[in-house]
Design a protein with these regions (language model features):
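Helix-breaking motifs and short loop linkers at transmembrane-helix boundaries and internal kinks
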Residues: 38, 70, 91-96
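Helix-loop boundary and gating motifs at the non-cytosolic
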Residues: 2-52
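Hydrophobic core of transmembrane alpha-helices in multi-pass small-molecule transporters
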Residues: 17, 85, 95-112
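Intracellular juxtamembrane helix-capping segments at the cytosolic ends
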Residues: 109-124
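Residue-level signature of mid-helix packing/kink "hotspots" within the transmembrane helices
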Residues: 52-60, 138-139, 143
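Symmetry-related core transmembrane helices of the 12-TM Major Facilitator Superfamily/SLC fold
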Residues: 156-174
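Structural signature of the two symmetry-related core transmembrane helices
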Residues: 73-88
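Helix-to-loop junctions at the C-terminal end of transmembrane segments
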Residues: 57-70, 149
Length: 182
């Protein structure tokens, strides 16, 4: 079974669909979530802006790390750190905590995001057949975030994010990027 999963379409589907679904879950309703915690629009804007700034700084670093250490190693560490960051974000109540943990998670997500396209291009399948699952996952994540927020609880989004990242990690384990360091 493991040999059939190695570089399979299923492995790529799991990686792309659930990574982007998780990304959407985590980020889609951040402003609503923070406003429900009592933060002003300016405070929400500060948290979101800080995350984009951290992401901008991280992207070139992720490229260098992926080249030096290997995509899979960098991704596995990043996925684990995203899940840990989500736990801390879920428990955060102070503005500085929300800023730090949201920025960390989004920095990691946006750091690996461009390298995801490398994985899609290197897969044994056409780029579009792999990348479409990221688009579908993101769209599903936006809708799912709203449903979870409204029907379960706002903080329930974060354990679901962690679950989706675990599924994405299973997909990552089934992929062997070309020219990756072992």
């Amino acid at each position: 079974m493991q040999k059939k999963f190695h570089n399979s379409y299923l492995a790529h589907f799991l990686l792309f669909n659930f990574f982007f679904l998780a990304y959407s879950l985590f980020s889609t309703l951040i402003s609503v979530y923070m406003q429900d915690l009592g933060y002003s629009n300016a405070q929400v804007s500060m948290v979101v802006s800080a995350s984009f700034f951290a992401s901008m700084l991280a992207q070139p670093i992720f490229g260098v790390l992926s080249d030096a250490l290997g995509i899979k190693k960098v991704f596995l560490f990043s996925f684990l750190a995203m899940m840990v960051g989500a736990v801390f974000f879920m428990k955060a109540t102070q503005l500085w905590q929300l800023l730090v943990w949201y920025s960390l998670v989004l920095m990691l997500v946006n750091g690996v995001n461009p390298v995801m396209d490398v994985l899609a291009a290197q897969s044994p399948y056409t780029y579009g057949k792999i990348r479409i699952w990221g688009t579908i996952g993101y769209a599903l994540g936006s809708q799912l975030a709203g449903l979870i927020y409204q029907r379960v609880a706002p903080q329930a989004i974060f354990p679901v994010f962690i679950g989706m990242m675990l599924i994405s990690s299973i997909g990552l384990l089934g992929i062997q990027p070309k020219h990756d360091r072992a």
